[in-house]
């Protein structure tokens, strides 16, 4: 009798674990593929992550990321997409330009942050919730003006509040004007996740 109870308990626990695992996988799949803010148009988007160059009649090839010239002459010239937005990869930026540190003027605190470079169309393709200010404009992006958008947690950590549009911060000792502050986003939204966003040309130079 006791043995039957033991096996019954094992079956129940095993079934429960199996169901829980399937549900967890389904939830993760939904989060990674569904249209969830700020990635509200995943089902309509295409991504260009790398460029492959072939030479010697296709016998050799060279793979690389999308450089500024390719972006300007090819991607921005596409007519089929409704919008073309360009970003840097925040996860690999430390390997390309080194660690990124941000500091409020006069403060001794200089936390390391995850920074993403982007263009002005980024804010039209992705739907962020602005708590203060607004994204940097096209003219600011094209002229390379040092602008930055912070997430809520970083703004509060640096300046103690979220109403900070128009104030300045130092990113690797370069002064940036805060354009706006957005609600924190989940790291699950890996294509747009960062703590601060700057015009991408400046992002590479920081």
What are these regions (language model features)?
Residues 1-4, 11, 32, 48-50, ...:
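Generic structural signal for small/hydrophobic residues in well-ordered secondary structure
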Residues 4-32:
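Short, strongly hydrophobic transmembrane alpha-helices
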Residues 25-101, 109:
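Membrane-proximal extracellular/periplasmic loop immediately following the first transmembrane helix
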Residues 87-135, 141-142:
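The feature marks short, hydrophobic/small-residue-biased sequence motifs that occur predominantly
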Residues 116-136, 146-206:
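Mid-to-C-terminal secondary-structure elements
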């Amino acid at each position: 009798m006791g043995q039957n109870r033991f096996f019954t308990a094992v079956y129940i626990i095993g079934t429960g674990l199996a169901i829980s695992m399937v549900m967890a996988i389904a939830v993760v799949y939904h989060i990674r593929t569904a249209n969830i803010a700020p990635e509200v148009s995943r089902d309509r988007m295409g991504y260009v992550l790398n460029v492959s160059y072939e030479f010697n009649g296709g016998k050799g090839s060279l793979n690389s990321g999308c450089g500024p010239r390719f972006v300007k002459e090819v991607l921005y010239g596409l007519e089929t997409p409704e919008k073309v937005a360009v970003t840097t990869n925040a996860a690999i930026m430390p390997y390309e330009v080194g660690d990124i540190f941000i500091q409020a003027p006069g403060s001794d605190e200089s936390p390391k942050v995850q920074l993403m470079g982007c263009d002005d169309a980024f804010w039209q393709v992705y739907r962020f919730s602005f708590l203060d200010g607004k994204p940097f404009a096209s003219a600011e992006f094209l002229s390379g003006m040092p602008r930055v958008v912070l997430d809520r947690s970083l703004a509060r950590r640096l300046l103690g509040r979220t109403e900070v549009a128009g104030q300045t911060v130092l990113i690797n000792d370069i002064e940036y004007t805060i354009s706006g502050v957005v609600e924190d986003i989940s790291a699950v939204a890996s294509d747009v996740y960062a703590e601060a966003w700057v015009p991408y040309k400046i992002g590479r130079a920081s």
